[in-house]
Amino acid sequence: MVLATNSRCLAYHGPLLYEAKILMSYDPSKRGSKAKVEDGLPPTVEIGNVVNTHKRKRGPRASLPAAGATPDGDDSNDKNRHFSPKEGKPDVPADLADENEDKICYYVHYKGWKNTWDEWVGEERVLALNEDNIKLQKELKAAALAAAKKGKDFDALAPPEALSETASPAPTTKRKSMASKDSPAEGPRPVKRRGGLAALEDLEKEDDYLKRKEIALVVPDKLKAQLVDDWEFVTKDHQLVGLPRKVTVVDILKEFKKEAEAKYRPGSADADILNEVVSGIKLYFDRSLGSILLYRFEREQYLQITQSPDHSNKTMSEVYGAEHLLRLFVSLPGLIAMTNMDAQSVAVLKEHLEDFVRFLSTHQKTYFLKEAYTNASPAYEALSKGL
C-alpha cells in the first residue's frame, strides 16, 4: 500500500528510525510522482529558519518574518517542492536514483532536520506511524545506547540539528559524491562519524536539545531585505556571487574587530571575549558554509572552488564574502542552541553578535554590492542540474 502524500511516517536513516513527513510519492506502476504541491505558492527562503512569503516586487521591498520563524512550525520544504522530471523520462523525478526507478519511493522530510536532508527513499525504509513502529523506534534507540555503552562502534546518524558533529547524507548524483572529498554540496560537513561514548552522549542529549529555545538575534530590516534580494538573485535570476570576493569574510571580521576593540582596554577580559567571538564566527562560517549556507544553484560553484588548486590552501572565509556571511546569522540562533553555554555566556555572546550585525548594517553599501552577482553561463546551469 502506498502511503499518502503529506502523511507522517517513520523512516530509517542509518540504523535508527526518525519521524518524517512524506512530501511526494513515486509509484512505478503509475509512472508518475504524486506530488500534492501546487504551483504558484509563495517561495520559501531555504536558509536557516527565515521565511520569505512574498513574491518579488520591483516596488516596495518584500519583508521577512523575524529570525526563527518557520512555516507551520516545521522546516519541511513541501511548500517549495515542485516535480522536476529526469531528462527523457517525464514521469520520473530528476533526483530519484536510477536503482530506485522500479520500486515505490517516497520523498521525505525528517522532522526537525534542515530541508537539505530531504531525500527519496525506497518503501523498505518507510514505516507507518503507529504504536508498534514507535515501539520499534524506541527499541532501536535503546539498542544503540547499549552498544555505545559497551564501547562498540556505533554508526547511527542522530538528527543533524542535534549533533555538534555530523555525517553527510548519501549523495544522489556522481557530482555530489565527488564533493564528499571536502565539505559536501549538500548536507552538513563531512567529519568522522562518532562512535562509542560520543554517540551515546549524542543520543542522550537529543531530547534535551529539542526542548531548548533559540536566542532571538535582532536583524535590521534593511539586512532582511538584503537576504530577500540575495535569495532572488540566486534562485530566481540564476546569478552567482563572483568568487573569490574582493572583500572576504576574514577581511570583514578584521575590520569589525579593529573597530570594536577600541572600546576595550588591551588584554582585558572584554577584549579577550571579543577575540573569541570573532574567531568563533570565522569557525562557524568555515564549518557550516557547505552544509547550510548554500542554495542548490550554488553548490556546483562550491564544488569547483573546493577542487581548485588556487584555493586548496584557503579556508572558505578567505574566499566568500558578506553575502554568505549574512546567511550565517539566520542560522546562528539554532547553532548556538546546540551548545552547552550557560545563560550568562549566551547573553554576552548575543550582545557581541548583534554588535556585529549592526556593523554589517552600517557598512551595507561597502560590503553588499549588486555588481558582485553575475549571470551563470549555460554550461554552469547544465552542470548544476547534473546534466
Curated annotation (Swiss-Prot):
Chief place of localization: nucleus
Gene Ontology CC: one annotated term: Rpd3S complex
Domain MRG, chain residue ranges per copy: 211-385
Every Tudor-knot domain range: 100-126
Residue ranges with Basic and acidic residues bias: 76-92
Subunit structure and binding partners: Component of the NuA4 histone acetyltransferase complex.
Protein's job: Involved in deacetylation of histones, chromatin assembly and chromosome segregation. May act as a transcriptional oscillator, directing histone deacetylases to specific chromosomal domains. Component of the NuA4 histone acetyltransferase complex which is involved in transcriptional activation of selected genes principally by acetylation of nucleosomal histone H4 and H2A. The NuA4 complex is also involved in DNA repair.
Protein name per its UniProtKB record: Chromatin modification-related protein EAF3
Lineage: Eukaryota, Fungi, Dikarya, Ascomycota, Saccharomycotina
